[in-house]
Swiss-Prot record:
The chain crosses the membrane at residues 4-24, 29-49, 60-80. Signal peptide: none annotated. It is a multi-pass membrane protein. It catalyses: a quinone + NADH + 5 H(+)(in) = a quinol + NAD(+) + 4 H(+)(out). This is NADH-quinone oxidoreductase subunit K. NDH-1 is composed of 13 different subunits. Subunits NuoA, H, J, K, L, M, N constitute the membrane sector of the complex.
Amino acid sequence: MIPLQHGLILAAILFVLGLTGLIIRRNLLFMLIGLEVMINAAALAFVVVGSYWGQPDGQVMFILAISLAAAEASIGLALLLQLYRRRQNLNIDTVSEMRG
């Protein structure tokens, strides 16, 4: 069994990597990928803590997080596809120009 601290440190590192990708990147696709990494890091933390306590609640939260991430990814990718068709670019700066 993996110690609680190791699992939580791994989840924290993944969360920080996703947050860094979300903040630094200007491409919306990479921002969406960073958000997915953050969601998976939080889900990993739920699984690790649930395993440590011997409760299935962490796995239930993981299933919920994965289903929400799938819905978020499908809607986000559909919006990105429409944006790319209109602007031929996925840069975040072009989205702010769409206001009018």
